[in-house]
Structure formats: structure tokens, C-alpha cells
A protein has these predicted regions:
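Conserved ABC ATPase "signature" region
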Residues: 66-67, 115-125
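Conserved ABC transporter NBD signature motif
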Residues: 59-67
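Short coil-to-helix segment of the ABC ATPase nucleotide-binding domain corresponding to the Q-loop/switch region
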Residues: 95-104
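ABC-type ATPase nucleotide-binding domains, specifically the catalytic core motifs of the NBD
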Residues: 103-116
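Helix-to-loop junction immediately C-terminal to a conserved catalytic motif
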Residues: 51
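ABC ATPase NBD coupling module
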Residues: 68-84
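The feature captures the beta-strand-to-loop junction immediately N-terminal to the Walker
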Residues: 36-38
Length: 125
């Protein structure tokens, strides 16, 4: 079985500070992982690299067939649809309805067709 997530010697800088150094791991289909650690240990930065929100400075990182160090902006929504992420502190937008909060997330992940969006939101609600 081949890895669906494969990180080799990954390094990440945030505001010129090295926050991840020499990260190496593989995750195969059906496996899962918990990221735990002290505040400031790089957990969120690592997750944000997987979500293509934080760039990889050095090394190689692949999720499915996406090279995270060279992913095209137009491919990011498709990548994000394939990844299940549970954020520690997720906040709804308090000035919006539940429908509008879900609409915001779907649009942010690349959904464009209004009929498909409405169907998906109605499934969830």
C-alpha cells in the first residue's frame, strides 16, 4: 500500500522563524494520527501545510497526487475537499445564519454551482 501523505525532510518558516525542521512521516489509507504537543510546537503549522495554507520552504510533501511545495492555487479547493480536518477552536460567524456559515465554507473550498450548494447544505441541516 502506498502513502497518501508523505513528508520528507520538510521545513517551514513562519515570520522568518524555523517552526518545523526535518519532518518525516507517511500515512497510508485507513490510518489516522493525532497531533499533540505543547503550545508553539508546530502542530498548527504542520496542519496548515497539509491544507496548503502555509508554504513548505524545504523538503518534499505530497498528499494524494498533490505536491504541496508546488500546488497551483486552482487545485487547493480540490485538495481540501479530500482532507478531513477537525480544528481545535472553530468559531461560527456570529453575524450569519447556520446556512450562511455553511455556504461560506463550501464556497471557500471551491463549490460554485448554487443548486449543488443548496442540496449539500440541506443534506447537512
Amino acid at each position: 500500500m502506498s502513502a497518501i501523505i508523505d513528508y520528507k525532510n520538510v521545513e517551514v518558516l513562519r515570520k522568518e522563524l524555523l517552526v518545523l525542521k526535518n519532518v518525516n512521516f507517511q500515512l497510508e489509507e485507513g490510518q489516522f494520527v493525532y497531533l499533540i504537543g505543547r503550545v508553539g510546537s508546530g502542530k498548527s503549522s504542520l496542519m496548515k501545510t497539509m491544507y496548503a495554507e502555509v508554504p513548505i520552504e524545504m523538503g518534499e510533501a505530497r498528499i494524494f497526487d498533490y505536491d504541496l511545495s508546488a500546488i497551483r492555487r486552482k487545485d487547493v479547493p480540490m485538495l481540501r475537499r479530500q482532507i478531513g480536518v477537525v480544528f481545535q477552536d472553530f468559531q461560527l460567524l456570529s453575524d450569519r445564519s447556520v446556512y450562511d456559515n455553511l455556504l461560506f465554507v463550501l464556497k471557500a473550498t471551491g463549490w460554485k454551482n448554487k443548486t449543488d450548494i443548496d442540496e449539500r447544505i440541506n443534506e447537512v441541516l
